[in-house]
Amino acid sequence: MKALRRSYTSTSSGNSSSSSSLPSSSSSSLPSSSSSSPPSSNSNSYSNSNSSSSSSSWIHLRSVLFVANLSSPSSVTSSDRRRKSPWSRRKRKWALTPHQWRSLFTPEGKLRDGGVGFLKKVRSRGVDPSIRAEVWLFLLGVYDLNSTSEEREAVKTQKRKEYEKLQRRCQMLLKCGNGSTDNLEELPSDEANSQCVRFVDDYKITGPMTSQDVVSALNTDSSDTDSCEDNEDVLLLSSFAHSDEKKPEEDNSNNNSEENSSLLVAAASEVQVEVAVHEDFSTWQRIIRLDALRADSEWANYSPYSTAITESKARRLAESVGLKDYDHLESCRLYHAARLVAILEAYAMYDPEIGYCQGMSDLLSPILAVISEDHEAFWCFVGFMKKARHNFRLDEAGIQRQLSIVSKIIKNKDSQLYKHLENLQAEDCSFVYRMVLVMFRRELSFEQTLCLWEVMWADQAAIRAGVGKSPWSRIRQQAPPTDDLLLYAIAALVLRRKLIIQKYSSMDEIVEECNSMAGQLNVWKLLDDAHHLVVTLHDKIETLSQSQSI
């Protein structure tokens, strides 16, 4: 499976194959009424006979098309028609416009109705490109739906500080090079103990630090940290020093000594853990840089800064994050690559359990194309990864669980297809690995990706907030948000199942077919197909999953 991850995340998407489509029930595919209208009174008998024959032919053709449509896999029952998804053709409208977006706020800058109307509009329409940078901050949880303008400004300031602190840690590691901890052993014991105390405190307050931070803290100017953090460090160090001074006067000196020893042992243990984290971080740094330099340039047409970046600005940023061998990149691509490095390293520091894995750059790249401020892009990525992070676990438990669900859906939706996959030893559905891992980023165009993701985010947020009272909403509310994406993958797969059954006789051919879907998928049709799968199969799949987990 790890080999599949490497293969699927590095393979370029093809564009040579055209997708199969289901028969349409739209009246536009049928002859107009005028073409079959009766002849005028002054027509001769021959024209009357010819027109009558033509009319009968059209009626027959309409009947055939109607019957064919009813027998199509895409046909739905009357019960299904009553359960319209937010993306049905009838409901689809223009994307949320800037004017509509502004009208959703009260004079205090608060979304009306707790954001209910906002979520409904976004999940059924999508978002105009000019306001995506603002809207995504709400969709991805950077700003609370009930926040005021003043509260959001405070959050923005705090989030910027937290991101800058993560950046400083990354810069420390970059300057330290190989991350040796020899200097730590050379420190006087008292000084080393003090640094351990600072390390433990910082760990508790802001998250994991590397062992090199313990060493670098000695030489770090106090201006590099917030004054409140300095005060906390001074208080802790002062408290630790005074505990030694009071020993002769206190009866519980032995207890204090034991407590101090325990503290140092705990701190040393934390340092050892962070040494291992630092070794991982060095590996992540190398992979991040390689992936950043190889990032595709499709985003450039959507980025607001793509044509405004000078060569000197791009090179300065690239050097600040340690990029090398970038002479082949134009300025806008180099700037984008440097931003990828900075934010992905900060995330690896923020979430060391996940760190970095190939494919994460695919998820971040669209966010960077939309949001120009690094600290805002970082926290949007954090919000995105809250749902996607289990896809990148080293044990692959998350991805295996999702592939298992894909397999169950196929088995219950199309037994003929499943039997064919069994014959090819592909029933584990690893051929949709890439779709699940990077959320259709490789199969959809860049604009389609942006549209799909923002609608998906709004849909998930709306369901969690209880928006909508259709049976579809109630069913989806019980499923983990990331499972929805699997349904999209299955919808795309089901649409092409006849090609797979009839043409392919090997796993490699199926993988190639999945990879060739780039640019051939209709986002709104994909969402509609996913809706029908959820309505018809969710309860059954949930029951099967629960019975197997017991």
UniProtKB/Swiss-Prot annotation:
InterPro entries (alphabetical): Rab-GAP-TBC_dom, Rab-GAP_TBC_sf
Glycoprotein among keywords: no
Disruption phenotype: No visible phenotype under normal growth conditions, but mutant plants exhibit increased susceptibility to the soil-born fungal pathogen Verticillium longisporum.
Low complexity: bias regions: 7-49
Induction: Induced by infection with the soil-born fungal pathogen Verticillium longisporum.
Listed GO MF terms: GTPase activator activity
Domain Rab-GAP TBC stretches: 126-460
Keywords on record: GTPase activation, Nucleus, Peroxisome, Plant defense
A Pfam family the protein falls into: RabGAP-TBC
SMART domains: TBC
Region (Disordered) residue spans: 1-49
Subunit-structure text: Interacts with AGT1 in peroxisome under biotic stress conditions.
Protein known as: Rab GTPase-activating protein 22
Organism: Arabidopsis thaliana (Mouse-ear cress)
Upper lineage: Eukaryota, Viridiplantae, Streptophyta, Embryophyta, Tracheophyta
